[in-house]
Structures are given as structure tokens and as C-alpha cells.
């Protein structure tokens, strides 16, 4: 069967169309132009009309260039040699290191059989009190970080990559600014975490098509490591850039647009990636934490809106902090009852008092008279925000719980907290006597 063709029917954006037979959806091809060659993937079949998206872009490609079909879908090497390496969205080295061509695996396969999944039961410690104490990240969970442009969401992901108690970090960047890419790279090296990290990166200067492959490559590699018994944390940023790349391709393909121009299968495409999160019985796990930026801080935007129906909660990053109101880990109750007996009490009591303090902050701003209780709440609010909510705080869960008791004791009497007597007697800080 003929696998090489030398006539391109149409070039539109990053998509080319050829007439070919015996071609499969998702199959790879090499487009050989005059001075270069680019990888392309079949994205549409209409009888003998085959549409391919060119990863390197179509600049310099003419209608007489040669297209050679490879007979397989996209593949990536899988071995421990991936650790500490940086690759682009096609799986090619970006760090100047050698190419890896052994033990190739296909990317983008189906999600694991639900019957093989086990109930989430283990906590992933991050060293961030707003996660560990108040909205615990659970092994095999899928959670987005909802934020807006300008917030330090990549810095938050970086801190989690450096501090999370997992075996392996797979970091996927889509549409990253070059400065952000260098920050990730340099910080992981200085923090000593690059040796347990695999970095797949697509920058804003790269072809938009490569943005689509980053999540699939990251998750396919993660799945193989999880089957080998590794606890893998996949960090993806930014899923809105991923969706925008889908939107651009669908417009080029003249597909009927849906909400705000996004393709009609946006939900399915997002769910397909998030459903890779899993805890294998007798093996490892995949936990997925992503950044989803909200244009105009609009949570009804199609990307965060669809994401919210797929994931098991969300973190809201506002004002450089993880907001306790709106942030939610729906699986936290699976683990926070087995950490320390005061975990849930501290979590509930501190958030309740912080919510009350918001009224006092508003009263003060409007010039109302402040009661002694208001003054206590204001003091508590300041301490809670500086010692618990600040992203620079890095302490173990047990220290964070002890810190919670110290903050409560600094601002309130035991009766004012509403905490049960037995826990007060066990954990309330004892006043030092000289």
C-alpha cells in the first residue's frame, strides 16, 4: 500500500489535506519540505480526504511537498532515563541531551478500567497548610487551580513540585512564557527536585499544535510509571491554553463552534485527560493537579465551567493566596479522619472564625464602632492570613495543626472557639509559668 504522497490538496493554518488510502485516525506522518521536515498527525478522515495537523507549523510547506505516513500513532520513549530530562510537546529533547528511542509506547490510549480503580485513601502532603489542613490533596484525585492572569499560579505549582511527598513529578507546560519555563527549570535544579521530575514543555513561541500533545504525553508516561508502583503527581499548566489550541484547530477545520467558539466536544476532551487519575490496586497512582486560568475572572467561562463538572473540587487562587471560600477538596473526608484526631475540628473551627472575621473587617472599613469581639476577630484574621494562608509557609501537617491551636489561643479563650472540651484539654497550649 502506498505510504508516500507528493500532492497536498489544501493548506489552512497548521492543517494540510491530502488524498490518501488506508490511513488511520491519529496516524503520524512526516512532511518533507524543501529545507526541513515536520511531524504531522491525522485529525480528520473524510473518505479519501485526509487532514493532518503539522506540529512545526505550515510555514515553508508547498503543495508539492512529500508526505510519508508512518503507520503508527504518536509514540514516546519510556524508561528511567526520562527522569531529570526536559522535552518538547512532541517528545523531543529540549535540554540538549540525547534523544531516547528505546521502549516506545503509544500515547493517548484509553483510561484504565474503572473496575481496576480503588477508593482513594492516602493523603499527599504538600507542606502548604491551606491544602494539607483545609482542603487535603488525596492520592488519585483530580483538582484544578482556578486563577486569573497575574496570580502566582505557576509559583504555586512549583512549590508543590518541590515539596510534595510523591515518588515522581511529571510537569506539563502549555503556552508557557519563556521566563516561566526558565523559572521552572532553574528552581527545580536548585531545589534538587529535577532528578525526580520529567518536564514536557510547550512555550508560547512554539507551534500551537504541540500544546495539544503535552497532556497526553505526560499522562501516558505517568500511567506507565504508576503501573511500576510509583506514586506520580502530574502538574499541568495551563489547561485554558490547551483548550484555546483546540479552539484554533477546530476553527481551521471549519467545525461548527459551540459556546464562545470552543469545539462542541470540549467537555469530553477535558474529561478524557482528567479521568487518567487513578490509584491502581497493588501498584502506584496518578494524581492530577492543573492550572485553569479564568479570562476576566469569569468562572462561567467554558473551560473552568466544564472543568468543575469533571474534577473533585478546586482551589481558588486569589490575591496570591489559596482562598478558603470556594476552594474545596471533595475527597478530603477520605483521609482527614485518619491523620490526627483534631484535624477536622481545627479545619472547621478556624474557617468558621475566619468567615466571622470578614464581617468585622467590613465593619471597620465602613467606620462602625468595634466591639472587643470584633477586635479579637481582626487579630485572628491577620494571624490566619500571614501564618496559614501565605504561600511561602512550608510546614508539615502536624506542625500546621499545632500552629492552628497557637493562633486560636492567641486570640480567643477556649469557650469562644466552640471546640469540644476533650480536645481543648488535649491540645490547647498551656501558658508558660515563670
Curated annotation (Swiss-Prot):
Domain of life: Bacteria
Transmembrane residue ranges: none
One Pfam family here: ATP-synt_VA_C
GO MF term list: ATP binding; proton-transporting ATP synthase activity, rotational mechanism
Signal sequence extent: none
Keywords: ATP synthesis, Hydrogen ion transport, Ion transport, Transport
GO annotation, biological process: proton motive force-driven plasma membrane ATP synthesis
Family per record: Belongs to the ATPase alpha/beta chains family.
Job description of the protein: Produces ATP from ADP in the presence of a proton gradient across the membrane. The V-type beta chain is a regulatory subunit.
Protein name: V-type ATP synthase beta chain
